[in-house]
Each structure stands twice: as C-alpha cells, then as structure tokens.
C-alpha cells in the first residue's frame, strides 16, 4: 500500500526531484532558501543521498517511457509516459509503480488533446511490457469535471474502486478507478 498522509494524491506529487522553488526572485541566489537533497557520489562514503537517476525504458515512433530510479530500494518507481500525438503535440502521463500496480494521477484541469490516445498507449504498455496486474487512476473528488471523467474512464474499461480496497490508500477526498489486467489471458495469446 502506498503511504499518502499529506495533501497530495500520490507520492508522485511529493517527490523532491519533481518539485521546484516556489519563490523565484531575480539574481544569482534566487533559489538559495529552497531545500535541496544532499548529493553523494555513488558508492562513496558519507551520509548524503544519491540523486535520482532517470532511465529510458522504452522508445518507439510514438511512445517514450522513462523511469526515475529510486534512491533506496523498496520505494515506488516513478514512470513517465510521453505519447507523440502529432509532431508538435505530446500527451504526458506520470505514474507510480508499486506492488505490481501502476498508479496514474490525473492532473487538475482539462485533459489535453490526445490524452485518450496517450492513456491507451500507457495501458497497452503496462499490460504487455510491465506485466502489472492493475492500473489505477486517481483524481480529486471535488473536481468540477468529475462526472465527465467518470463517464470517460468507465467507457475505457475502468471501474470505480470502493473504499477499503487493499491496494489503495484510505483517502476520502480522492476518487480511485481501476483497470484490471488479466495476465493469464495475455500470456495465452
């Protein structure tokens, strides 16, 4: 189970490597008051942390998948999906891989053009290459577009996750939907 005790939906929103300074002031020290992770030479001595590394997992003419390697083993992996809709338009999805499940956080605001194609490519990749058992999507229940999102994702095959599901955190303010992947059927093809 993923630990999400703060205001974010998934740990994806809390990852220090994805956060940037909130107070940008001109000058050479514009980010001096922001906390920075300690740097450490891999394999070296010291109490610092290794910076996150990103690895290319997959690339074809439309889909690029990269993964932020965690600093410590046992932590969830952050996976980035970029689907090229056109030469100038890209659909991007960020997800967390944990315990044979992929958690995709739906960003606030309107979904970009091409998001459906990007999500379908993500689902296909998750099933065929990552061999996950479930793909979960999550978004805040208070969204104004909640009803259209539920309808859209239900049409794509997602089901609403009931409270208390063992794979999702207890978050009353967050709606979870799941797309179960039956790996037994895909292995027989």
Curated annotation (Swiss-Prot):
Keywords associated with the record: Nucleus, Phosphoprotein, Polyamine biosynthesis
GO molecular function: ornithine decarboxylase inhibitor activity
Protein task: Ornithine decarboxylase (ODC) antizyme protein that negatively regulates ODC activity and intracellular polyamine biosynthesis and uptake in response to increased intracellular polyamine levels. Binds to ODC monomers, inhibiting the assembly of the functional ODC homodimers. Does not target the ODC monomers for degradation, which allows a protein synthesis-independent restoration of ODC activity. Involved in the translocation of AZIN2 from ER-Golgi intermediate compartment (ERGIC) to the cytosol.
Self-association state and partner proteins as the record states: Interacts with ODC1 and thereby sterically blocks ODC homodimerization. Interacts with AZIN2; this interaction disrupts the interaction between the antizyme and ODC1.
InterPro entries the record matches: Acyl_CoA_acyltransferase (IPR016181), ODC_AZ (IPR002993), ODC_AZ_sf (IPR038581)
PROSITE patterns, sorted: ODC_AZ
Alphabetical GO biological process terms: negative regulation of polyamine transmembrane transport; polyamine biosynthetic process; polyamine metabolic process; positive regulation of intracellular protein transport; positive regulation of protein catabolic process; viral translational frameshifting
Family statement drawn from the similarity comment of this UniProt entry: Belongs to the ODC antizyme family.
Compartments reported by the entry: Nucleus
Domain of life of the native organism: Eukaryota
Protein name: Ornithine decarboxylase antizyme 2
Phosphoserine modification, residue list: 186
GO cellular component entries: cytoplasm; cytosol; nucleus
Keyword Cytoplasm appears in the UniProt entry: no
């Amino acid at each position: 189970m993923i630990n999400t005790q703060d205001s974010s939906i998934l740990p994806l929103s809390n990852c220090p490597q994805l956060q940037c300074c909130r107070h940008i002031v001109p000058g050479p020290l514009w980010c001096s008051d922001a906390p920075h992770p300690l740097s450490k030479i891999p394999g070296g001595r010291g109490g610092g942390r290794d910076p996150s590394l990103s690895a290319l997992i997959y690339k074809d003419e439309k889909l690029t998948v990269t993964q932020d390697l965690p600093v410590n083993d046992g932590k969830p992996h952050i996976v980035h999906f970029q689907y090229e809709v056109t030469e100038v338009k890209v659909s991007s999805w960020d997800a967390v891989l944990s315990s044979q499940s992929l958690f995709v956080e739906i960003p606030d605001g309107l979904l970009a053009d091409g998001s459906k194609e990007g999500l379908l490519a993500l689902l296909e990749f998750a099933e065929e290459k990552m061999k996950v058992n479930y793909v979960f999507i999550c978004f805040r229940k208070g969204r104004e577009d909640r009803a259209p999102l539920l309808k859209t994702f239900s049409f794509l095959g997602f089901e609403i996750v009931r409270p208390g599901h063992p794979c999702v955190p207890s978050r009353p303010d967050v709606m979870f939907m799941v797309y179960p992947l039956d790996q037994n059927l895909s292995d027989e093809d």
